[in-house]
Design a protein with these regions (language model features):
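A short, flexible loop at the N-terminus of ABC-type nucleotide-binding domains that lies
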Residues: 1-2, 11-25, 74-77, 116
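The feature captures the beta-strand-to-loop junction immediately N-terminal to the Walker
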Residues: 39-41
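Helix-to-loop junction immediately C-terminal to a conserved catalytic motif
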Residues: 54
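Conserved ABC transporter NBD signature motif
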Residues: 62-73, 81
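Short coil-to-helix segment of the ABC ATPase nucleotide-binding domain corresponding to the Q-loop/switch region
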Residues: 98-106
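Conserved ABC ATPase "signature" region
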Residues: 117-128
């Protein structure tokens, strides 16, 4: 599975007096099986970039391809994309709030709409 960003630009509040360019012609290629880390100062665009990787934000300009398909094409399966493109937060203790580790690990499968049984089965497998 590959993820390619081509000349991705993103502007907050485009067309207003408050317009801010957060990403400016970003090009990035993440190959099959690769893991990446993104570092930078506060306000440098890290979170904005990451939100583009699974289609949470739509680029103002440019394109994003997952396995060769443009994720911005009409009727693209964004839900399917989000089941395959994952993120790990820098400070997970600020992101997860469940009473047990198992319930925290169920977070991803739960958001995929899986049954409680399937969530727990996948979480237990991941924790082995």
């Amino acid at each position: 599975m590959s993820l390619v960003l081509e000349n991705v630009t993103y502007r907050y509040s485009q067309g207003t007096a408050y317009e801010i360019t957060a990403l400016n012609h970003v090009n990035l290629s993440i190959g099959d099986g690769e893991f990446i880390g993104i570092i930078g100062h506060t306000g440098s665009g890290k979170s904005t970039l990451v939100q583009h990787l699974n289609g949470l934000l739509k680029a103002t300009e440019g394109a994003i391809y997952f396995n060769g398909e443009n994720i911005y094409q009409e009727k693209y399966d964004l839900r399917g994309l989000r089941t395959q493109v994952g993120m790990v937060f820098q400070y997970p203790e600020h992101q997860l709030f469940e009473a047990t580790v198992l319930e925290d690990v169920c977070f991803g499968p739960k958001n995929q709409g899986l049954s409680k049984e399937e969530q727990q089965e996948r979480a237990r497998e991941a924790l082995k």
